[in-house]
Amino acid sequence: GQTEFAKDETFGYHASNLCEYIEEKTGGKVRAGDVTCISLESLRAMDFDGIEAQLLAVHDYGHVIVNAVADCDVKVFAVALYRAMAKGRHFTIRSAAALVKAIGNISDQPLLTREKMVTQESKAGGIIVVGSHTKKTTAQLEELKKVQGIEFIEMDSDKVLVPGELEKEAAAIVAHCSQQIAKGITCCVSTKRVVLTLPDDTPEAALVRSVAISDALQSCVGRLTASPAFVVAKGGITSSDVGVKALRVKCAKVLGQIRPGIPVWQTGAESLFPGTPYIIFPGNVGEVPT
């Protein structure tokens, strides 16, 4: 619990051990000792039978964590998972892309080129929205400002404190960005880089503000009147809200990665801007020049 993520105003935590993390986040409803832990030693020993037995022993919505470090570890777990599922077990899985790749037996692919990513030419500009407050994101944003041809707009997210003001701010940004994108200019909209904190604040109140700010930010995409050539969302919550709420994506084609850990979707026909490349850029991913 010593990283900047652990100290997050809304989603902070104390426990770094995932078993203890689950106990912390469930308020003690799930005890750390009751969490099934698939050890790295079992994975490296390719103990398929042992891991399968652990999975078969899970019941009543029990929790499982997998201590995988590399793709080879994930592949071992995927085999044991398949075997347990073949015996009638059902699991709800929350994971990163590595498990999807292993389960689907998807081979390594080269990083995307512009030709692979852009399937329909457009003279419009793109839209970039930055919600993450991590130090890495802020450094990356400053690096991006060195690129010519992008207009940078900082949303005054502190207006969330005054009813109706943040919505007015977002509406003005939407109108301006729509005009610029239609002219072929790419716009980058970011929240203020300093997280808003208040005296005697509570995590619940901070979460309410965070949701309101995220809604305002995603509306800068969802209410555009011009179709952008591409969409980039920086930050976990931001990228989720932009994909689901703003772009209204129900089905998308995963084109691949533009950089390690940065996937690209091609939005479906049902979405707000069909066939548009959507770059999902997590807040803690990449280096400063990425």
Where are the model-predicted features located?
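A glycine- and small/hydrophobic-rich beta-loop-beta segment
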Residues: 116-217
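Generic secondary-structure signature for well-ordered alpha-helical cores
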Residues: 10-13, 20-31, 56, 60, ...
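Long, internal scaffold/assembly segments composed of regular secondary structure
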Residues: 71-135, 146
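Cap/lid and interdomain-hinge subdomains that line or gate substrate/regulatory clefts
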Residues: 1-74
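Extended C-terminal subregions enriched in glycine
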Residues: 207-237, 243
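General beta-strand structural signal in soluble alpha/beta enzymes
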Residues: 30-39, 64-68, 91-96, 101, ...
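Active-site histidine-anchored catalytic micro-motif
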Residues: 1-16, 228, 233-236, 240-289
